[in-house]
Amino acid sequence: MPVRAQRIQHVMQDTIINFYSTSDDYGDFSNFAAWPIKVDGKTWPTSEHYFQAQKFLDEKYREEIRRVSSPMVAARMGRNRSKPLRKNWESVKEQVMRKALRAKFEQHAELRALLLATAPAKLVEHTENDAYWGDGGNGKGKNRLGYLLMELREQLAIEK
């Protein structure tokens, strides 16, 4: 690799790409971004709709979440604790997110290209609203969404 290419590679490795709002430069990485996904024969308006619905075993309630008008409403319904969460939710939530992300980035070529073009930058869901999926706003959160996107980016690059 030429020296200049090595320098560019090094700069990109140190690059952090923050995303959160759908209006951000990389807002399409947000689960709230309006990219429909088809999973198990059903079309979901956003990956957020799909993810929130999977918290519940009640098929009728899952369908209600699928049909709501916005990902914000879907997220609110996902926090409804008057409905019982599936017992294994904590152990399967990352698997569910992986499935949603894979569907989103496989089914939309332009999104896949955008994700692949970010390599090898670190992807960070930058928000103080979430210290599990995001960075907690201060960098101390787990940033699991960012890490799952980087994992998917690696897989898609290999499959290319």
From Swiss-Prot:
Its EC number is 3.2.2.-. It comes from the Bacteria. Keywords: Glycosidase, Hydrolase. It is an enzyme of class 3 (hydrolase). SUPFAM superfamilies: YbiA-like. This is N-glycosidase YbiA. Signal peptide: none annotated. Belongs to the YbiA family. It comes from Shigella boydii serotype 4 (strain Sb227).
